[in-house]
């Protein structure tokens, strides 16, 4: 079972952002419009090495995560010692 978002979760990684966009087949420009950041900013975020984020970048990562989860029903899966990180699309609720 995948972990759900909690305060302890790290920010989503650049690879997770790229993977989610690939799964959804959306461009950096489309995602940028949704989270109100420039395509150039997304290019930098997706190319940045993993590591600590300053408050501004963490806010952008959090906005991307919220948009992907709420708007596109993406689920981010965080490493737990037995599995690595990943993304998947949530199933729609059954009637």
Where do the model's predicted regions map?
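Residues in the helix-turn-helix
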Residues: 30, 41, 60-63
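Recognition helix of helix-turn-helix/homeodomain-like DNA-binding domains
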Residues: 36-56
């Amino acid at each position: 079972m995948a972990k759900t978002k909690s305060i302890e979760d790290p920010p989503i990684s650049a690879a997770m952002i790229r993977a989610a966009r690939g799964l959804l087949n959306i461009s950096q420009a489309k995602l940028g419009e949704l989270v109100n950041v420039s395509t150039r900013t997304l290019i930098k975020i997706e190319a940045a090495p993993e590591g600590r984020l300053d408050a501004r970048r963490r806010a952008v990562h959090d906005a991307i995560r919220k948009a992907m989860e709420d708007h596109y029903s993406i689920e981010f899966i965080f490493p737990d010692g037995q599995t690595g990180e990943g993304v998947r699309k949530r199933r729609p609720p059954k009637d």
